């Protein structure tokens, strides 16, 4: 993987953050339901 300009790196970071948010959302759902 060759390092590219920030313009191409930013969308990847946004996708990673989005996936983490979805992952945390799935993990928190059961706890929220029990609360």
Swiss-Prot record:
GO terms for biological process: anaerobic respiration. Keywords: Electron transport, Heme, Iron, Metal-binding, Sulfate respiration, Transport. The keyword Electron transport applies. It comes from the Bacteria. May bind 16 heme groups per subunit. 14-15 of the hemes are low-spin bis-histidinyl coordinated, and 1-2, high-spin hemes. GO terms for molecular function: metal ion binding. The keyword Transport applies. May act as an electron acceptor of the enzyme hydrogenase or as an electron donor to rubredoxin. Homodimer. This is High-molecular-weight cytochrome c. It comes from Megalodesulfovibrio gigas (strain ATCC 19364 / DSM 1382 / NCIMB 9332 / VKM B-1759) (Desulfovibrio gigas). The lineage of its organism: Bacteria, Pseudomonadati, Thermodesulfobacteriota, Desulfovibrionia, Desulfovibrionales.
